[in-house]
Amino acid sequence: MTLDQEKKILIVGLGLIGGSYAAALSAKGMEVGAVDPDPDAIAFAEKNGFIRHGRTEPDADYVGRFDLIVFALYPHILLEWLDKYGPWLREGAVATDVTGVKSGVVEKAQALLCPRVEFIGAHPMAGREVSSVENARADLFEGANYIVTPTPANTEETIECCEALGRLLGARSISRLTPKEHDEMIGFLSQLTHCIAVALMTCKESRHLVDYTGDSFRDLTRIAKINENMWTELFLWNREELLSQMDLFIAHFGKLRDALAQGDEETMKGMM
């Protein structure tokens, strides 16, 4: 499928990311609709021009109109949605997601939809420390990295359609990784860094530390303010890979600690 101005796009889930997708695509002149159980989210998105129309409940007539469907949902909710409403999607449509884990999710989604609808995983590497559609921004993905995670079940045409979506959003760099490669990369670059930030914030009573904090602590802990429900689910979906990355970090942190304990200046300088 070629992604052009004639194509209709459905966003399922109007939070920060789904709302920002809607805002960015509407700003490019695309017809965007949405499904979200929160009537206030639908009303806000309509009022601010993020979407042309929306529903709080999916129905076959509505969801069957769209050529491209973007799921901005937690992994387990995405799979539940596809299991229940997937047959309503138009034959020949393309479906994609924004979830931060791919192994298991992509394969299960494809099994629920194929061959009528082709599902391809994608992950925009952008976000904010706040949630909800009220904080959505049309420029959220400008200059961001955008990862597409095709499998052998995907055609080249669909892969290129998903990459075109990334370009419409304003992504600077678009990459292709397998779901496994994605989860290994994301376990280190994103999930591990969030774990470190959370650990820093919880290892010491911090009520009065704000009076003495400098840039280094603020920079390291900025991402500690996270959606605990979403990130817990993402960590558990990627548990084995994240544990491997945590063990790697602990080993290198231990090496630095040992060098400090032994007064080993050369090792410390080398690591720095």
Mark where each language-model region is.
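Interdomain hinge/lid region at the active-site interface
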Residues: 208-272
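NAD(P)+-binding Rossmann beta1-loop-alpha1 motif at the extreme N-terminus of oxidoreductases
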Residues: 1-63
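Internal alpha-helical scaffold of NAD(P)-dependent oxidoreductase catalytic cores
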Residues: 138-223
